[in-house]
Swiss-Prot record:
The gene is gltX2. A motif ('KMSKS' region) lies at residues 241-245. NCBIfam families: gltX_bact. Monomer. Pfam families: Anticodon_2, tRNA-synt_1c. The keyword Nucleus does not apply. It comes from Paracoccus denitrificans (strain Pd 1222). This is Glutamate--tRNA ligase 2.
Length: 468
C-alpha cells in the first residue's frame, strides 16, 4: 500500500446485541482517524451468523453509533450479502494455486488431532489433500483451504504493537470455503476490506493472531495489505477484562446514566490514546490530534470518576440548544416523557447557572426540579419546616417588596437582605421559606437563580401560594 491512497477505515461489528463500550471506542478511533485526514469511515455489519444476527440487533448497533455522534460514509455493508463474492475469491485462489480442495471429513480431522495429542505432536491439521494430484480427486463435497507457507515467518507490521512475528509452522491451512459452500470469517473479512478499499484496520488486539492469517490471504491474492493497528482492550478498575461485574458495559447504559455523547467521545478517546497531558478537548481537537502513535500497548482502565469530570466539563461548555438536545436524548434513553414546551421555556433560562455545577444530565435535572414542576408546588416534609407562621409572614413581606422590582439579581437580593435586617435575620433565614415556596425542597440552586429563571409572574404566584 502506498501513502498516496486516501484513508479509509471501517467499523465491523457483529450484530449480536447492544453496542459494547469496547466496540464504541473502536468505532470512535476509526472515525477520528478518518475524519482527521479527510478520509472515509465505513460501516460493515458482520452478519454471517444468521441465528444471532437479527434486524433488531443491527438496529441497536446503528442506534448506538448515532447516539455517540459517529456518522459513516455510504450505506452499511452486509457481510452476508457478499457471500458469492467471497466464494468467487476462494475459487480464484484454487486457480492460482494458493488454495486446494480438501476432502477430509470432520471425523477424520478429529481423529488426526486426537492421535497427534496422544503422541505429543502439534494438533494443527495437516491435510493429506494439500499436494494431491488434481487428476485423482474424488467426486465428493470438499472444503477449500489456504495453501499456507510451511516455512519462514509471517510478520504483522502493527502501528500499535510494532512488528509481531508468527512462525508459519504454527499457522495451519485454514478453511476458506466450507464444504457447504459458505465462506469463513477469515476469508470474508479480507475480501470485504479489500473490496471496500480499507487502508487502515484499527481493531482490538484480540484480533492480532487473525492478522497473520489474513495477511497470508492478502499475499495469496496479490492484494495491498492495509495498515494494522491492534488496540488494547478495556479493563475494569481492578485491571481485569471489562465485564458486567464492573458495571455498565453497553453504550446504551451510559446514555441512560446521563453522560452526554460529547463527553463519551472525549472520554473514550482518552481511554488508551493520549495527546500529551490533554484530558479535555472537543471534536475538532480530537480529529486534529488523533494518530496511531498516541495509542498505548497497555490495557486502559475504566474510571468513572474521570468520566464524571469529563462529563461535567462538557456540560458546562454546551450552549443551550445543544444541552436541551442532550437532555431530550437522555429522557428518551430512559423512557421518560419529553419535556413540554412550558417546561423547556422555564428550564432554558436556568441552564446557565445549572450547567456549571452538574456532572451528569440527571444531576442537572435534579437541580432543575423547580423549573419542571407546576403550581401548586408540592412541599416536601423537610422543606415544610421552613414555612412556619413567622416564616410565612416574612415571605409575605418579601412578596410585596419584590412585586414591582426591576427583576434583576442585585435588586432581588437587596430586597431579601433588607427584609432580613428588619427582622434581625441573616439572608439564609429569609431564603429558606422562599426556597420552599419556589421548589418545595430544602436543597435547591440559588433562590435568586430560581427567581430569574421562573420569571416575575411565576415566582410571585408561587410565593403568594405559601405566604398566605
Amino acid at each position: 500500500m502506498t501513502d498516496s491512497r486516501p484513508v479509509v477505515t471501517r467499523f465491523a461489528p457483529s450484530p449480536t446485541g447492544y453496542l459494547h463500550i469496547g466496540g464504541a471506542r473502536t468505532a470512535l478511533f476509526n472515525w477520528l482517524f478518518a475524519r482527521g485526514r479527510n478520509g472515509k469511515f465505513l460501516l460493515r455489519i458482520e452478519d454471517t451468523d444468521r441465528t444471532r444476527s437479527t434486524p433488531e440487533a443491527t438496529e441497536a448497533i446503528l442506534q448506538g453509533l448515532r447516539w455517540l455522534g459517529l456518522d459513516w460514509d455510504g450505506e452499511p455493508v452486509s457481510q452476508f450479502a457478499g457471500r458469492e463474492r467471497h466464494a468467487e475469491v476462494a475459487h480464484a485462489m484454487l486457480e492460482n494455486g494458493t488454495a486446494y480442495k480438501c476432502f477430509s471429513t470432520t471425523e477424520e480431522i478429529e481423529a488426526f488431532r486426537e492421535q497427534a495429542k496422544a503422541e505429543g505432536r502439534s494438533t494443527l491439521f495437516l491435510s493429506p489433500w494439500r499436494d494431491a494430484d488434481p487428476a485423482g480427486l474424488p467426486d465428493a463435497p470438499y472444503a477449500i483451504r489456504l495453501k499456507a507457507p510451511r516455512d519462514g515467518e509471517t510478520v504483522v507490521r502493527d502501528a500499535v504493537q510494532g512488528d509481531v512475528t508468527f512462525g508459519n509452522a504454527q499457522l495451519d491451512d485454514m478453511v476458506l470455503l466450507r464444504s457447504d459452500g459458505t465462506p469463513t470469517y477469515m476469508l470474508a473479512v479480507v475480501v470485504d476490506d479489500h473490496d471496500m478499499g480499507v487502508t487502515h484496520v484499527i481493531r482490538g488486539d484480540d484480533h492480532l493472531t487473525n492478522a497473520a492469517r489474513q495477511i497470508q490471504i492478502y499475499q495469496a491474492m496479490g492484494w495491498d495489505i492495509p495498515v494494522f493497528a491492534h488496540i488494547p482492550l478495556i479493563h475494569g478498575t481492578d485491571g481485569k477484562k471489562l465485564s458486567k461485574r464492573h458495571g455498565a458495559v453497553g453504550l446504551h447504559e451510559y446514555a441512560a446514566m446521563g453522560y452526554p455523547a460529547a463527553a463519551m467521545r472525549n472520554y473514550l478517546a482518552r481511554l488508551g490514546w493520549s495527546h500529551g497531558d490533554d484530558e479535555l478537548f472537543d471534536d475538532a481537537q480530537a480529529k486534529a490530534w488523533f494518530d496511531l502513535d498516541g495509542i498505548g500497548k497497555a490495557p486502559a482502565r475504566l474510571d468513572f470518576k474521570k468520566l464524571e469530570h469529563v462529563s461535567g466539563w462538557h456540560i458546562a461548555r454546551m450552549d443551550d440548544v445543544e444541552l436541551l438536545d442532550e437532555i431530550a436524548d437522555f429522557r428518551a434513553a430512559t423512557g421518560a416523557e419529553p419535556l413540554s414546551e412550558r417546561q423547556v421555556a422555564r428550564l432554558r433560562p436556568a441552564l446557565g447557572a445549572l450547567k456549571t455545577k452538574a456532572k451528569t444530565l440527571p444531576a442537572l435535572l435534579e437541580q432543575a426540579h423547580f423549573a419542571l414542576i407546576d403550581r401548586p408546588v408540592q412541599i416536601e416534609e423537610k422543606a415544610a419546616a421552613a414555612l412556619d407562621i413567622v416564616s410565612r409572614s416574612i415571605l409575605k413581606e418579601l412578596t410585596a417588596a419584590v412585586q414591582n422590582a426591576s427583576w434583576g439579581r442585585d435588586e432581588l437580593e437587596a430586597a431579601a437582605k433588607q427584609i432580613g435586617e428588619s427582622h434581625g435575620l441573616g439572608l439564609g433565614k429569609v431564603a429558606a421559606p422562599l426556597r420552599a415556596a419556589l421548589a418545595g425542597r430544602s436543597s435547591t440552586p440559588s433562590v435568586f437563580d430560581m427567581m430569574l429563571a421562573l420569571g416575575r409572574d411565576e415566582t410571585l404566584a408561587r410565593m403568594q401560594d405559601q405566604a398566605g
